[in-house]
């Protein structure tokens, strides 16, 4: 296997990064399920993901990053104790709700004053974010009401008629998606 820090050596990852940069949608494995991703600053791409999933915009989406530094635009003014809490929990399957202060498109945040963020430890997710140069949208690859895809084949069945770029790889060892918590209250939104 090619080390994922050399994403340019993997043609499928190179194509996925190119798709992200051109405003397209990609499908890729994460820690527990396959995800759909795009450039969070491209409202047309985010809208396509919402349409594919039949997901209402008000629910919001997750941003996933390769490193905490990729999220600095959201974290630079956090109190030190909260920044340290994030550092201690990442990389890993911990998604946190943090205030976005208008720094993220409403297409991503939905009706919320917070945005869900995570630093992944999955090598393919990290490589995609590194190649793209920042965080990407991450949401399970399934239409609303159907189970999240666990394989590329299942994603292709769900979205057979859609033009998506597919990363090669398998999901990580987690049986469930990441836990989502509020950074300030520790309230669990999704276990």
UniProtKB/Swiss-Prot annotation:
- By its UniProt entry, which PROSITE patterns does this protein fall under? YRDC (PS51163)
Q: Which stretches make up the YrdC-like domain?
A: 10-191
Q: Which reaction does it catalyse?
A: L-threonine + hydrogencarbonate + ATP = L-threonylcarbamoyladenylate + diphosphate + H2O
Q: What is its EC number?
A: 2.7.7.87
InterPro entries listed in its UniProt record: DHBP_synth_RibB-like_a/b_dom, Sua5-like_dom, TC-AMP_synthase, TC-AMP_synthase_SUA5
Is Metal-binding tagged as a keyword? no
Give, as one word, the top-level EC class.
Answer: transferase
A GO term from the CC aspect: cytoplasm
The record describes the protein's role as: Required for the formation of a threonylcarbamoyl group on adenosine at position 37 (t(6)A37) in tRNAs that read codons beginning with adenine. Catalyzes the conversion of L-threonine, HCO(3)(-)/CO(2) and ATP to give threonylcarbamoyl-AMP (TC-AMP) as the acyladenylate intermediate, with the release of diphosphate.
**Protein's name in the database:** Threonylcarbamoyl-AMP synthase
Naturally occurring in which organism (per UniProt): Saccharophagus degradans (strain 2-40 / ATCC 43961 / DSM 17024)
Classification lineage: Bacteria, Pseudomonadati, Pseudomonadota, Gammaproteobacteria, Cellvibrionales
């Amino acid at each position: 296997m090619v080390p994922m820090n050399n994403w340019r050596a993997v043609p499928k990852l190179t194509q996925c990064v190119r798709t992200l940069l051109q405003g397209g949608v990609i499908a890729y494995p994460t820690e527990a399920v396959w995800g759909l991703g795009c450039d969070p600053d491209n409202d047309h791409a985010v809208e396509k993901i919402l349409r594919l999933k039949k997901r209402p915009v008000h629910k919001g989406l997750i941003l996933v990053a390769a490193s905490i530094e990729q999220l600095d635009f959201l974290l630079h003014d956090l109190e030190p104790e909260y920044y340290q809490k994030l550092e201690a929990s990442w990389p890993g399957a911990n998604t946190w709700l943090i205030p976005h202060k208008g720094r993220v498109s409403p297409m991503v945040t939905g009706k919320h004053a917070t945005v869900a963020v995570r630093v992944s430890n999955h090598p393919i997710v990290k490589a995609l974010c590194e190649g793209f140069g920042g965080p990407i949208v991450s949401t399970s690859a399934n239409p609303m009401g159907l189970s999240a895809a666990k394989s590329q084949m299942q994603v292709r069945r769900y979205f057979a008629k859609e033009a998506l770029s597919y990363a090669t790889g398998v999901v990580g060892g987690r049986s469930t998606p990441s836990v989502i918590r509020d950074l300030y209250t520790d309230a669990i939104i999704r276990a």
